[in-house]
């Protein structure tokens, strides 16, 4: 990569980080102004268009980055699990770390999931689907269950995890710890239920084939 290309990438990165830094519990992406984001990134507002077509393209890039960041962290969690950690507890701890370290990235995913922009809703849905698919792959490999079962289990788990994440954004450390314990219990219940449901289905098949 040449010097000019490196500088362009650095400025683009600064714009993304500037936009993330301006999000908060009170401030959504829709309320950000191009001028403020450009000023925070240290460039003239007119230079913004050298990097993004418009503010929406910046937002979609942020959604993609948030989803990718979360998936990469969960992959690292699965590597930790492979070394002997508890699957559910390690995954929950990693997820809560993500929210603690990147609250605005998670806020963006939550808000735009049901926001007014169809493009943003589709982008968030795509990221969540990637997340579900990766978890289903892992469950299929570990539990030796058919894809239909692991996908249903993964979708239930991700739905509960995102709901808990929304609560975790605005509570203190002690409440977050309690929330984490509740989430571990809920996910274990889903995992047990999926296992017994699958076993029951297998028994039915075996019974009918006799």
Curated annotation (Swiss-Prot):
The keyword Manganese does not apply. Its main location: cytoplasm. GO terms for biological process: fatty acid biosynthetic process; negative regulation of fatty acid biosynthetic process. GO terms for molecular function: DNA binding; DNA-binding transcription factor activity. Residues 10-70 form the HTH tetR-type domain. GO terms for cellular component: cytoplasm. Residues 33-52 bind DNA. It is found in: Cytoplasm. InterPro entries: DesT_TetR_C, Homeodomain-like_sf, HTH_TetR, HTH_transcr_repressor_FabR, Tscrpt_reg_HTH_FabR. Pfam families: TetR_C_46 (PF21943), TetR_N (PF00440). SUPFAM superfamilies: Homeodomain-like (SSF46689). Keywords: Cytoplasm, DNA-binding, Fatty acid biosynthesis, Fatty acid metabolism, Lipid biosynthesis, Lipid metabolism, Repressor, Transcription, Transcription regulation. Homodimer. Represses the transcription of fabB, involved in unsaturated fatty acid (UFA) biosynthesis. By controlling UFA production, FabR directly influences the physical properties of the membrane bilayer. PANTHER family: HTH-TYPE TRANSCRIPTIONAL REPRESSOR FABR. This is HTH-type transcriptional repressor FabR. The gene is fabR.
């Amino acid at each position: 990569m040449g010097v000019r290309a490196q500088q362009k990438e650095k400025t683009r990165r600064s714009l993304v980080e500037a936009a993330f830094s301006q999000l908060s519990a009170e401030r959504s992406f829709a309320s950000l102004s191009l001028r403020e984001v450009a000023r925070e990134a240290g460039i003239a507002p007119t230079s913004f268009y050298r990097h993004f077509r418009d503010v929406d393209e910046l937002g979609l890039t942020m959604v993609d980055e948030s989803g990718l960041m979360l998936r990469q962290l969960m992959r690292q969690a699965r590597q930790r699990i492979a070394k002997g950690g508890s699957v559910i507890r390690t995954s929950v701890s990693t997820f809560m770390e993500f929210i603690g370290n990147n609250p605005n990235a998670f806020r963006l995913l939550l808000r735009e999931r049901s926001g007014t922009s169809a493009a943003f809703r589709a982008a968030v849905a795509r990221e969540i689907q990637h997340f579900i698919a990766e978890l289903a792959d892992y469950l299929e490999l570990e539990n030796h269950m058919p894809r239909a079962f692991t996908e249903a289990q993964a979708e239930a788990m991700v739905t509960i995890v995102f709901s808990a994440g929304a609560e975790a954004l605005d509570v203190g450390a002690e409440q977050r710890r309690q929330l984490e314990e509740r989430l571990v219990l809920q996910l274990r219940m889903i995992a047990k239920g999926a296992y017994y449901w699958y076993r029951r289905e297998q028994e039915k098949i075996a019974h009918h084939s006799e």
